[in-house]
């Protein structure tokens, strides 16, 4: 009877266990701009990926058979502005493109590419702008969007 209860307990525990996954190194393959080769950007993307994966009830483990490898491919801020007398309107669109591979037992199972954008629009009656600066909030929003799209496309 004890053996039967023990086996039933083990089956119940294994039925509720989380699936494990590992995030391999995030590589920054951006060639132009201020984020070209920036390791801080790659580290930030890895942290965002870990947060999203844990929110989806996966357990992060270094010895997991399933892993994700992410490459940052493109980063740009497109600026669009209009000025009429003293009135001005400025729109900044931050774009980030990244690719991801789902690897199971050393074999690439799926490859996806995703694009994340964040838009910042400001209007003013007098514009004093140094120009050429990136909005940290725009970059963070675009990174979060691209990471969520990668995970959704990999169907995790």
Predicted regions and their residues:
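Soluble non-cytosolic domains of exported or imported proteins
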Residues: 36-47, 90-93, 129, 133-145
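A structural "domain/chain start" motif
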Residues: 7-59, 78, 113-115, 126, ...
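Surface-exposed short loop/turn segments
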Residues: 64-115, 119-133
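Charged, amphipathic alpha-helical segments and their flanking helix caps
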Residues: 121-123, 140, 148
